[in-house]
Amino acid sequence: GHGSAKIFKREDVVGKNVVDLLDPTRFVTTYYEEGVGFDESFGGIAQTYEECRADTTAIYLSFKKEALDIFKVPPEKQKDFTLCQILFMVNTAMKNLYFYSPETKKWSQPHSAARFAIFKALLNWGNDSVKLIKNDQNEYIVWVDPENLDGCYEAIKKLLIHLNYYKSTAQIERGKEFFLDLISVDEKWIQVRNYALTKKSRKGVFCQSVIRKTNDGKYEIDEVSNDPKTILDC
């Protein structure tokens, strides 16, 4: 994802009749001037935009048999693999609402904002393949329809096309408007965030085995438990 999307310069556009990706009836007319790139043009949202583009590319490729074959995902499990990618993304987006500050109206983590944008794209353009449901107990549930992955694909495809298009053709203002809308958090989402915070789990503690050299020059592995005292003793 990070390595994709050509940056159009003057020589790529002027006189080349490059068909506009979003409007095939016209040609591309915008490009980056010499010495100007994506980062400085898109400013403060550039990193988040790029993380979103990379994650969106990864999900898009999870729909492609050619990509899954490379990683030896069996044909009978490829649909489940793709479904797991969608479930992981929407679950992470919900949990990562923690990184949005209602006080400053800013995200503290680019990856978190990027995943939230993907989640909103699935809700907006996924043809009901992904739904956010509030039940009678005031709980929020994310529902993904395993029989409508085509809807997820169309949403991811639309998002990726727009992200690549605005970046490649230096459509700076349109790109910013498009992306800022996806990462914006209104009062409805603040309520979802508040609920997500009640489900926030404690940070995990991971403790690996310890390799020690014995007096006779050999090595042995000490298996340790994950209780605090044992970790400190190691």
Sequence positions of predicted segments:
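Non-catalytic terminal regions of proteins
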Residues: 132-234
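Post-HEXXH active-site segment of zinc metalloproteases
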Residues: 3-50
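Catalytic glutamate of the conserved HExxH
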Residues: 1-3, 56
